[in-house]
Amino acid sequence: MIGPGMMRYYLLVLLVGLPLLALAKPVDCTDKPECWPEGSAMQMGLLLNQKQEKADKQMAAKHAALVSLAAASSSDSTPVDERLLKALKSQQAAWSLYRYEECELIGSLTGAGGRWPSTWAAQCVVNHTELRMRRIRSAIACIQKIPGDERYSDQNRCLQQLAPLTNR
């Protein structure tokens, strides 16, 4: 039989130990930034990946809006330029692949060890995405400034900025 002193001891251990267990980090905590030391390559890389996921969703929505805007420039006398719409979509998909490959090279060129090349590559992807978003927003704003009856013939000049490697 457990005496009153031992019962108090067990109760004290439970009262002190349970909150400490709740504060303990899970053993399998590798996919969250808070699981890694602040400033570490893993923490920074995971934070950048979270930022990138959010930015990719925003960019997909903005790009879809741009394609819709370009499609809306048609009229009864001028049909939708299907080739342009297909090119906008294809170029965006190709740009996305290019961005990752370019940034993988950038990360590798740092010469850093451990996880740092991946972290630098992730930062590069974020930078490229932010620049692309600025260009998409700028193209949308440019097209919106063109009077409706002139959009079909003038919108292409606004879209030129989406091909910066060719149009310098």
What residue spans do the PLM features occupy?
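Positively charged n-region of N-terminal signal peptides that target proteins for export
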Residues: 2-10
